[in-house]
Amino acid sequence: MKLYSVAYIPQSYEVLGLVKGSMVQSKHIGRDIMAGLKGIVGGEIKGYTEMLNDARNIATDRMIEEAHALGANGIIGISYVTSSLMSNTSEVLVYGTAVKILS
């Protein structure tokens, strides 16, 4: 599966449709405590960085599964959105256009 963030690729392709994947991740109380401390002293909150990277990877895998089900061999126009659903949860959504690259 070829993944592209651009909306158009130079190869000939057939558009198969929208594909998406999402992952909702809850924060761990231990991470919240460490995040609070980091908020005071500054610096990267590695636990949250790892959590969001894992969520992005899972969401991407789910999008790829949807594309495979349509018979796609590529996805173009990929975009990621991250949002907070509740006080202790984050959602990562990824979406793009499934395509069958012909050449």
From Swiss-Prot:
Gene3D superfamilies, sorted: Hypothetical protein apc22750. Chain B (3.30.110.70)
Origin superkingdom: Bacteria
Matching Pfam families: YbjQ_1 (PF01906)
HAMAP family hit by this protein: UPF0145 (MF_00338)
Stated family: Belongs to the UPF0145 family.
Protein name (record): UPF0145 protein HH_1800
Organism encoding this protein: Helicobacter hepaticus (strain ATCC 51449 / 3B1)
